[in-house]
Amino acid sequence: MNELHDGESSEEGRINVEDHLEEAKKDDTGHWKHSGTAKPSKFRAFIRLHFKDSRKFAFSRKKEKELTSEDSDAANQSPSGAPESQTEEESDRKIDGTGSSAEGGDGSGTDSISVIKKSFFKSGRKKKDVPKSRNVSRSNGADTSVQREKLKDIFSPHGKEKELAHIKKTVATRARTYSSNSIKICDVEVGPSSFEKVFLLGKGDVGRVYLVREKKSGKFYAMKVLSKQEMIKRNKSKRAFAEQHILATSNHPFIVTLYHSFQSDEYLYLCMEYCMGGEFFRALQRRPGRCLSENEAKFYIAEVTAALEYLHLMGFIYRDLKPENILLHESGHIMLSDFDLSKQSNSAGAPTVIQARNAPSAQNAYALDTKSCIADFRTNSFVGTEEYIAPEVIKGCGHTSAVDWWTLGILFYEMLYATTPFKGKNRNMTFSNILHKDVIFPEYADAPSISSLCKNLIRKLLVKDENDRLGSQAGAADVKLHPFFKNVQWALLRHTEPPIIPKLAPIDEKGNPNISHLKESKSLDITHSPQNTQTVEVPLSNLSGADHGDDPFESFNSVTVHHEWD
């Protein structure tokens, strides 16, 4: 996928290098000249590929003017008063061709790049035209003979092919850093055989999730293994690409972290952060009454709102919010997972800053309008969990990002009352309740005590008409500016102690959970040998010999996302 590759024009870089390697020739002086068919900017692109890290090289603009002058007497004169060195920033600007002109620049000493650059563009220059003053040096006075030899090797017949292959590999694997500057995508060798299974965490209709240990580092991960055959059979192939893309491009504390993705002949693999707290749904089941107090629920709803805001800013609609898809980090904070039902807008817009007329506090007076990022995006897919499906999805009239705010209201209600507001005896009754019934807040003796602001927020999130629903006009800004969240410090959510702190397994000396108390599942095919089990299980070794013809997963890229905190 193009989105996972380097944002720079790597193809253009490759073409330029090949052109110059073919056109570069050696003249009688032992220097290098060019055929004159390429523009100077192409040479700069070539030089940057080789000397990207050599920031101490400097150009002498006055020297360059003299060396390229037709008057040989002027060329033989040495510049006076030239500074000994040049700052790294000035050198970089001149390598880019964005520095001062030859007429207006200050002399600063020449180097091997200057000489090659001038002889490279001076096509047809003969030996007698070459100035006698050829004593070149680095700005710091060091000898450049090593650099000369390196460049000669580059342009030698044997060096051309070798260096071109090296440059292609460098350009292809150049790291992409996202706007947050905290994650990069790099090319590394990792595959199913790099991990060993430990335990089965869960399973679905097209795959399973395992706790795995990386053999090299000993770190634990959650490995999602998806069957290609089942995805094709159930027409869910595109969902794997959507999930990989969202996970690989997202960088948010409340969204699960992706580390590796790759494939074998039979399976797709998504290697993600192992959330030791498990499913949020399980944590709710262990609470008294299987529910939370209003203040406890407010904390988690605020974190989910922040995660949805980020997804909408990225142009994604989540569409599958429910307790089972929320994981608990070991710190107790939530992490959204399972993005296979998510949808991305093809024409995501830019967010706008809005000011609330009746802001609950000065710190919440301004917010980002996330609706503007996906304002014109509608989809007609009938997806979601039955009790969480929005009315517009049931009607089949298409839906927008407003469905995420409907599901947020259902989730909030379930946190407080341990049930969903429109649940019926069967699917048809549930859908009928969603379409026609208003939300009811129980008032029995042991019913939770809920404030009027809390009820007001839930009612506004569960408005049947998506155009009148809270969040339909300005997205997350509408929700965050509701008076119920008056005292929430959104920027400090990650540093607030959660109501539920998971009880974790003991930690070993390497900081990994001690899982010696867990019994290995008999369904796991650790030996990868069919003779040892009658149940066909997912192997974690690369399968071979399968011939799928037209493979719809051919473009499922192998990606490793490196995080700065690793």
Swiss-Prot record:
Keywords, in A-Z order: ATP-binding, Kinase, Nucleotide-binding, Phosphoprotein, Serine/threonine-protein kinase, Transferase
GO CC annotation: cytoplasm; nucleus; plasma membrane
EC number assigned by the record: 2.7.11.1
Active-site residues, Swiss-Prot/TrEMBL: D320 (proton acceptor)
Domain Protein kinase, first and last residues per copy: 195-485
Gene Ontology biological process terms in this record: phospholipid translocation; signaling
The protein's name in its UniProt record: Serine/threonine-protein kinase ppk14
Organism field: Schizosaccharomyces pombe (strain 972 / ATCC 24843) (Fission yeast)
